[in-house]
């Protein structure tokens, strides 16, 4: 800690935020190891792992959002952090979705039972809400000048465009991300994680200034819960319905339209 005292205040705050994120990642990793060793019932095991994964994602995103506002004049630094922590999440959160849309996709494609899907969805929503209270308690300690609990209790509207465009942006981001998630399953793990991290960074760059480009209902609930309370319909449609529609359109496209097109091309070649 003494090594930070000689640094400018802004750099100190950034280092503290990064340190807190890494501590949360390490703590959640330790908790996952203990859970895998001690929990043997599939439902309980899945609930705890999904809870821990969603908590890690939500906390790190809260801090990243804080850092992006702190250094808004240098978006390259923020995008670098998004890419780095996307890699961290990809490496540490294997086997979990941390996203209701991902669970929905697996359920529709038959990769997960409805019961297991319901358990994972419940874990994600509970974790998203719990993360807010934990972050509020931590930020109330004022470890940096940007950490104060009133910040997380206020609605900071992230939608900087009209609602129709916001819906389209979130739906397209969800469509693209889950398409990649589905079709890169056969790619080597090390390469797949980098590709998905780069894609997340690109989507954050393309749509972040308009809606935040979250394409994750649980994460949106954690980040913008006061806004859901003030304008439920608007935020529910943009951050819950739109990403879900993106996943449904992706599944319909690749399960029905593209196979039909492929078969039609084969029949034309035979003729």
UniProtKB/Swiss-Prot annotation:
Q: Name one Pfam family in it.
A: MIP
Q: Chief subcellular site?
A: endoplasmic reticulum
The lineage's top-level taxon is: Eukaryota
> What does its PTM field state?
Not glycosylated.
Q: What is this protein called?
A: Aquaporin-11
Q: Which organism is it from?
A: Rattus norvegicus (Rat)
Localisation per UniProt entry? Endoplasmic reticulum membrane; Cytoplasmic vesicle membrane; Cell membrane
The record's domain comment reads: The NPC motif is essential for oligomerization and water permeability function.
Q: How does it assemble?
A: Homodimer; disulfide-linked. Homotetramer. Can also form homomultimer.
Q: What gene is behind this protein?
A: Aqp11
Coiled-coil annotation reads: none
Could you tell me which PANTHER family the record lists for this protein? AQUAPORIN, AQUAPORIN-11
Give me the segments passing through the membrane.
15-35, 42-62, 77-97, 167-187, 195-215, 235-255
Q: What ranges are annotated Cytoplasmic (topological domains)?
A: 1-14, 63-76, 188-194, 256-271
Motif NPA: where? 216-218
In which tissues does this protein get expressed? Expressed in retina specifically at retinal Mueller glial cells. Expressed in adult testis, in the elongated spermatids (ES) and in residual bodies inside Sertoli cells.
Membrane-topology annotation of the record: Multi-pass membrane protein
A biological process term (GO) from this entry: protein homooligomerization
The job of this chain, per UniProt, is described as:
Channel protein that facilitates the transport of water, glycerol and hydrogen peroxide across membrane of cell or organelles guaranteeing intracellular homeostasis in several organes like liver, kidney and brain. In situation of stress, participates in endoplasmic reticulum (ER) homeostasis by regulating redox homeostasis through the transport of hydrogen peroxide across the endoplasmic reticulum membrane thereby regulating the oxidative stress through the NADPH oxidase 2 pathway.
Q: Which reaction does it catalyse?
A: H2O(in) = H2O(out); glycerol(in) = glycerol(out); H2O2(out) = H2O2(in)
Record's GO cellular component terms: cell surface; cytoplasm; cytoplasmic vesicle membrane; dendrite; endoplasmic reticulum; endoplasmic reticulum membrane; plasma membrane
One MF annotation (Gene Ontology) recorded for this entry? identical protein binding
- UniProt keywords, alphabetically: Cell membrane, Cytoplasmic vesicle, Disulfide bond, Endoplasmic reticulum, Membrane, Repeat, Transmembrane, Transmembrane helix, Transport
Hey, which stretches end up on the Lumenal side? Answer: 36-41, 98-166, 216-234
What family does the entry list? Belongs to the MIP/aquaporin (TC 1.A.8) family. AQP11/AQP12 subfamily.
Please tell me which stretches of this chain the record labels as motif NPC: 99-101
